[in-house]
Design a protein with these regions (language model features):
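Charge-dense, helix-prone N-terminal extensions
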Residues: 18-161
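Extreme N-terminal basic, low-complexity initiation segments
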Residues: 1-14
């Protein structure tokens, strides 16, 4: 059995921007989970196994919340973080030192936008602090909204063809 990849913080650079997380600098997103060997995790299990047992438990529950809200969604790794596809990219999540990040920003449902506002980061992406209860029910609501949005977009694109 292979050892999990080595993860550590990288030196800052302002020349790159993360396409999903929406950060202005690479310093913001190349955090503790980024492999120093430049080898990205290939599966969600591999990604999750690199963390402490406490964080692994949280990540597994986030994964379960997404799976239950989006039956049939395909697990993948995109930009070195866990992601789900269903009629296109659905949601992403990542573990950081003090929080779980959940992406993309929520748009299109004012009630849900209000519900997530306390967790909104600078770019509208969500940050769930690890020292507070993780709102798994809210993660399910967000995922269901994204399923609905992706389905509508997919249907519209198919009609154009």
């Amino acid at each position: 059995m292979m050892d999990p990849p080595s993860f550590s913080r990288r030196a800052p650079s302002t020349q790159l921007s993360h396409p999903i997380l929406g950060c202005d600098s690479i310093q913001s997103w190349k955090c503790d989970y980024m492999p120093t060997s430049h080898v990205a995790p290939k599966t969600l299990d591999e990604y999750i196994s690199a963390f402490s047992p406490e964080v692994q438990a949280v990540l597994q529950r986030v994964r379960q919340a997404v799976c239950s809200a989006a039956p049939g969604a395909q697990e993948t790794i995109s930009d070195r973080i866990p992601a789900f596809r269903l009629n296109g990219m659905l949601v992403y999540f990542a573990a950081f030192t003090k929080h779980i990040g959940f992406y993309p920003p929520i748009r299109g449902d004012s009630r849900l936008e209000k519900a997530v506002s306390r967790y909104a980061g600078e770019k509208g992406n969500l940050r769930f602090p690890l020292d507070q209860p993780i709102p798994y029910g809210l993660i399910k609501r967000i995922t269901r909204l994204r399923v609905k949005q992706n389905r509508a977009k997919h249907t519209t694109e198919r009609k154009k063809k």
